[in-house]
From Swiss-Prot:
Compartmental location: Cytoplasm
Name the record gives this protein: Trp operon repressor homolog
DNA-binding residue intervals: 56-78
Function in brief: This protein is an aporepressor. When complexed with L-tryptophan it binds the operator region of the trp operon and prevents the initiation of transcription.
GO BP field: negative regulation of DNA-templated transcription
A cellular component annotation (GO) from this entry: cytoplasm
Stated family: Belongs to the TrpR family.
Pfam families xrefs: Trp_repressor (PF01371)
InterPro entries, per database record: Trp_repress, Trp_repress_bac, Trp_repressor/repl_initiator, TrpR-like_sf
NCBIfam families: TrpR
Main location: cytoplasm
GO molecular function: DNA-binding transcription factor activity; sequence-specific DNA binding
Record note on quaternary structure: Homodimer.
């Protein structure tokens, strides 16, 4: 199986998952604790960037993450399609 095929399979598995318990189980099976923490930090970063007027440095300090991670998240939000999608999915 190619990486592309595996990626498509992963997307299908995640899309077919309809309970939070099942999703948690899948994520715990395929991600290391460190990878899970990185994903959680990204969600926290997007939430702060989308829902506050804090500077990137303030967000980094508040969340206890590197300014590099904040800058990467802010760069992703420059794409209006991504920003609109995340705004609909992420809220307080």
């Amino acid at each position: 199986m190619s990486r592309e095929q595996a990626f498509e399979m992963l997307i299908k598995i995640l899309c077919k998952t309809d309970s939070t318990d099942d999703m948690k189980l899948i994520l715990e099976c395929i991600l290391t604790r460190s990878e899970m923490e990185d994903l959680i930090d990204r969600i926290r970063i997007y939430n702060e960037l989308l829902n506050t007027n804090n500077s990137q440095r303030e967000v980094a300090s508040k969340l206890g993450v590197s300014i590099t991670k904040i800058t990467r998240g802010a760069a992703n939000l420059q794409d209006n399609n991504i920003k609109d999608f995340l705004r609909k999915k992420i809220s307080y």
